[in-house]
Amino acid sequence: MKKWAPRVLLAAALAGLSAFLLKGDVWTFWTWWLLAFLMGMVAMPVTGRLFAGFEDKGWMFSKVLAITVTGFLTWFLVTAKILPFTAATCIGVSVVCAVGCGVLYHFQGKNGIDCFPSGKVNLIYGEEILFFIFFLMWTYFAGFRPQAYGTEKFMDYGFMEAMMRSTTLPARDLWYSEGTINYYYGGQYFAVFLTKLTGSKVELTYNLMRTFVAAFAFVLPFSLVRQMSVDRLKESLTGKKRCVPAVAGIIAGLSVSIAGNMHYVVYSKIIPWLQKLQGREADSYWFPDATRYIGYNPDVPDKTIHEFPCYSFVLGDLHAHVVNVMFVLFLVGLLYAWMRSVRMREAVIMKPGRKEFWKKQLLIPHILLAAVMVGMFRFTNYWDFIIYFVVTGGVVLFTNIVQFDGKVKRILAVTAVQAVEIIVISYVVSLPFTLQFDSMFKGVGIAQNHSMIHQLLILWGLPVVLTVLLIICIIWEKLRGGANRSLYKLMKAISVPDLFAIVMGFCAIGLIVIPELVYVRDIYENGNARANTMFKLTYQAYMLFGMTMGYGIFRMLVAARKKVFKVVSVIGLVLLCWTFGYFGNSVYAWFGKVWEPSEYKGLNATSFLSNDFTEDVAGIKWLKKNVKGSPVVLEANGDSYSGYERVSAMTGLPTVLGWYVHEWLWRDDTADLNEKSADIESIYTSSDEEYVKELLEEYDVSYIFVGSKEREKYGETLNEDVLKSLGEVVFQDEVYSTYILKVNK
């Protein structure tokens, strides 16, 4: 009892702290945490087998696996038009999956298979505490700036509202009423899936989903790198060194989830310090500068983007690349678990018949699941489909080189067949998305612009140097004395965690180099050609580097035989920890005085309406309360990243045309968009009643919203007499002149 008392007290203290900090929002917060706990525990019969070599049996990864399987199955059944997208469907699919896990657990028990981490209570407790702390921390911060307004938030929140209304997927495009969403909407889908599963309100879960992902961005790298460190250093872990795996895991988790880059160190600390020494006024620092450096400082016509998770979690967009963070981290952990399981066995003996051999190679659970995950990325974040097909292929190739004793023909044959298997499975499972998706891909272009060397060094010098140093350290140790000269012998001599770190490092470096050579063409050719390519590739490189550095620094500190590796590792660790200061800088700049709980505003993402859209808030609330389904509500269209489309974004109700640049990117038909824009103007301003009526019928408009943006855009040309003659006023603001018309049909 005495042993458990401190743990119970700590858990109770954290529960009390969460209630104090989150106030009324704590119930939804607890619901999501409890759901993740239960889903992860129920999925352990599957996860425990996949991560059998992990000390925690993949406990943290099990949460993501459960969400992935239940959410993906629900999506597949809905998009295949087998089931409607309702709360009952989400719950039903989850229950069926839970029953399946229960049956599997029963048979495992009969066969003496232990899928739970027996004897690792302290480890599981520690991981759960870390998950709860980071989930609480980010949720609390979000409550200081909860509004789904600014940057991409209208789109992200609008996607969620549209899917909450829809019983089919993809949902009707809220900014293009004649079509369905033509973008990879999977991230917002999973947020809606969890919202329906828990019976929560989307106004709260918009913010909760991003803080949920942020918590996983710490605990998954922690769990993986901790296990890698245990596997590599277990013989050296005596005395005080026993804490090394946990510390390495923490550094990896922090590197992925809250670190910045050396831009913060150079431009926020070093340069201002030098300016003060010279008696000059120190430059101020704005945290987004770390993501808009190449092309902006100095200002040249090659604007790029190089964001990273901490920036995303602070900014608050629930974009595709953000939600997919937890899924790609799960995949990386799964690949390590597979590589480890192969290396823990003896090399495959080729005596079994040809049929049995190929059956075994094609039915590897880890590869089958990896193929499904890669396919799922097509609709969660399409770029990650390409990136992690290559990462998965790299792990498969390196593993097969070792597994098949360096026999080239066998290695190439098996790797090629498994690559085809991954492509085929990923293609099949993503068919419900790809069959309804018009690709935005316009081809690959040769990069005409290149980053300045000093900029690359500031952004990527630290992780690249530490990664290359780790690779040199590992290879040098194995080549000493003339041993392991062949590629196979060298790779065979390298331990599993070292080999996996090398794969992650090579992939990360490749992702940095690619935008310097080629880019994917899109609508941003003029001055921003490399922006999207660099953004999506280097975002993943950042996470791979974070885990590689977390592992590599402590691996070299403990196990390197040359002092130079240890010295550089210490320097690297100091610089890496210095980048953690970005977290504090950005949190204060964006959220304000987070140390004052009284400033907490709550998680309601629509709370900004009362101040920013005073004239429209009552009308928007009326639509949310009274209009069911997805009828077309006409509002004035406007530019992307503006206050236009506040009605469709906050209600999920489709309008004829929304943010122009977004629809241009998604549909690439400016003539059509311009025609719709002109038609909307005609509806609001034309004096020809019959013509307006024809347009309303053509676009199947059910409601017309007349509020602040409509008066701002059309001014005195707004023909309210014609509009009112074509419908009934169903809402009239008592204070302002905003009203809603229901069109006569």
Task: Identify the residue ranges that each predicted region occupies.
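Membrane-embedded, hydrophobic transmembrane alpha-helices
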Residues: 1-122, 422, 427-478, 507-515, ...
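Membrane-interface alpha helices of multi-pass inner-membrane proteins
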Residues: 312-315, 368-380
